[in-house]
């Protein structure tokens, strides 16, 4: 794979029954890219997110092109999907803490090593401890409590609600909890389908800044053009089952699209002029004998 490439789809076909949803899809995710997927309602935007998330499988095109999905190592993909918390009696805090299970396991092992190192000078123990410390820092394991509380405050959820059962929240509130859980998980590739739904303006403005500086990749489907303009740097448009990549935010995409349409219309006009010129020439000369034919007729 190319340098900084996290994820790549090559020549994918997605169809349900005999209905083609996406055809010959080539899609790339580079490190730290913020990507929007745009297109008309029903064109396959959410279908593409589901393909990336692994919820559905692609079909292979009937061609000689190499088809498939490739990733740079193991990529953790997180998808803000339709909320479906199965354990309704679990508190919000208990649900959120599931994200930090690797942190807690790492912390537990570090405490065990600390006790072992009190009575042993084994360098292997020290090396393992150093590795675990580095892992804790990479997972933001030393600040998980603060990160969790900050997220809840940003999303307008009171800290006392951490003790409430998930089932006692409305659908919109549960969506917020799911969103907080995803952000705290910090996946390598974050998939967001209409992320600004159920959010007030201050939260949206905070989210814009957070995603823009997020140090991993984000893929967004949203009708909020202002939000996209603030966050994304790449746009993929799905049109007539196919997909095209544009560099820049939503406004830049629209400008490039308009310029392409103007060029297309100009090329069409030039083509029609050439067709007319050739047609007129043929009409003018089709019944006129050539010099060779005239000579032979003598």
Which positions does each model-derived feature cover?
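ABC ATP-binding cassette signature C-motif
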Residues: 1-268
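Intracellular alpha-helical coupling/juxtamembrane segments of multi-pass membrane proteins
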Residues: 256-278, 282-298
């Amino acid at each position: 794979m190319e340098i900084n490439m996290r994820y790549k789809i090559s020549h994918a076909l997605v169809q349900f029954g005999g209905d083609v949803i996406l055809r010959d899809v080539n899609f790339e995710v580079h490190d730290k890219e913020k990507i929007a997927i745009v297109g008309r309602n029903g064109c396959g935007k959410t279908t593409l997110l589901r393909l990336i998330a692994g919820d559905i499988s692609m079909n292979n095109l009937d061609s000689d092109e190499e088809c498939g999905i490739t990733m740079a190592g193991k990529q953790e993909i997180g998808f803000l999907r339709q909320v479906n918390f199965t354990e309704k009696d679990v508190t919000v805090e208990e649900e959120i803490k599931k994200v930090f299970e690797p942190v807690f396991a790492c912390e537990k092992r570090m405490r065990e090593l600390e006790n072992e190192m009190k009575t042993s000078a084994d360098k292997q123990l020290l090396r393992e401890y150093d590795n675990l410390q580095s892992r804790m820092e990479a997972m933001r394991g030393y600040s998980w409590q603060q990160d969790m509380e900050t997220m809840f405050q940003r999303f307008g959820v009171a800290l006392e609600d951490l003790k409430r059962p998930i089932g006692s929240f409305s659908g919109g509130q549960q969506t917020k909890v799911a969103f907080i859980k995803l952000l705290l998980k910090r996946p390598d590739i974050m998939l967001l389908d209409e992320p600004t739904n159920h959010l007030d303006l201050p939260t949206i403005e905070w989210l814009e800044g957070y995603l823009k500086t997020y140090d991993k990749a984000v893929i967004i489907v949203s009708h909020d053009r202002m939000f996209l303009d603030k966050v994304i740097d790449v746009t993929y448009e799905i049109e007539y089952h196919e997909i095209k990549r544009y560099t820049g935010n939503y406004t830049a995409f629209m400008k490039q699209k308009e310029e392409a349409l103007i060029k297309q219309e100009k090329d069409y006009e030039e083509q029609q002029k050439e067709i007319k010129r050739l047609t007129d020439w043929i009409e003018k000369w089709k019944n006129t004998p050539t010099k060779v034919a005239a000579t032979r007729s003598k």
